[in-house]
Amino acid sequence: VSGDGSVRVPVVRNAIAAAARARVAVTIPGTKVIELAAVGTPCVSCTAFNAPELITINGPLTYLNRIPVAGAAMKRAVVTRYARRFTYHTQPNMDAERELVLELRGTLTPGRVARVALERLDDAAWLEQRSQALTGLYREHVGASVRMAAGVLALQQAV
């Protein structure tokens, strides 16, 4: 947000590098939340139930809404029941067993999401605390791909 109140949203090629420089990110549950946590970017994750029949879920149930007449109602019921089973919807929160990523759930409006994101953006203590906690959560995994590749190369050379 610039001084005159206008909002600039850049188009970037390397999203995670841009996210690492962001003060806060707004996203949906998924791999991006883990990536944001790894670089220490606090985020607000949105699980909108405005149209639960359109939510993508793993496995064949994702296509349930395509069944004529009753499919959408069945998928709505399955998605809302499934969502209630879990305390958290984002992997960092599941791994930490506490809320590090702010999760918004339910019927969401752009205004509500923006209001919450702006409140967090103005809360320097929250931003700092969440950034440190998220960075620490996956610290031991930093460099895992390099270690794995080195292990594979060592095995190949041993053969």
Regions flagged by a language model, labelled:
Residues 1-159:
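Nucleotide-activated sugar donor-binding and catalytic core shared by glycosyltransferases
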